[in-house]
């Protein structure tokens, strides 16, 4: 099972979602920013690293929002989703097709990766 972390980044009543690049698995679907936990990292350290690599931001990682195990055809992931806020930086599309800030009632307008639903 692959350990994965993601950030539910809140700002002014909205949260950030990111669109995966077309060339990657589950391309053009939306997700919460994050990635795989390396063996030497805590989940929080992995989330901070992934957000620096993918968005050029530093996070303030909060409490766990949700834990889920999802089986894709090609892998099984244990996803830990953390509440978070941006400490420094402005999100950049370094590894994503698009970034959106949405309200909770807008979530159904976006096609998400199944583990992020």
Residue ranges and their predicted role:
Residues 1-16, 36:
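Conserved N-terminal beta-strand and adjoining loop/helix that marks the start
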Residues 14-53:
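Conserved Nudix-box catalytic region and its N-terminal flanking loop in Nudix hydrolases
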Residues 47-52, 64, 82, 99, ...:
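Hydrophobic packing within well-folded, soluble alpha/beta domains
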Residues 54-61:
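Short secondary-structure junctions
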Residues 67-90, 100:
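Active-site-adjacent beta-strand/loop module that shapes the phosphate/pyrophosphate-binding cleft
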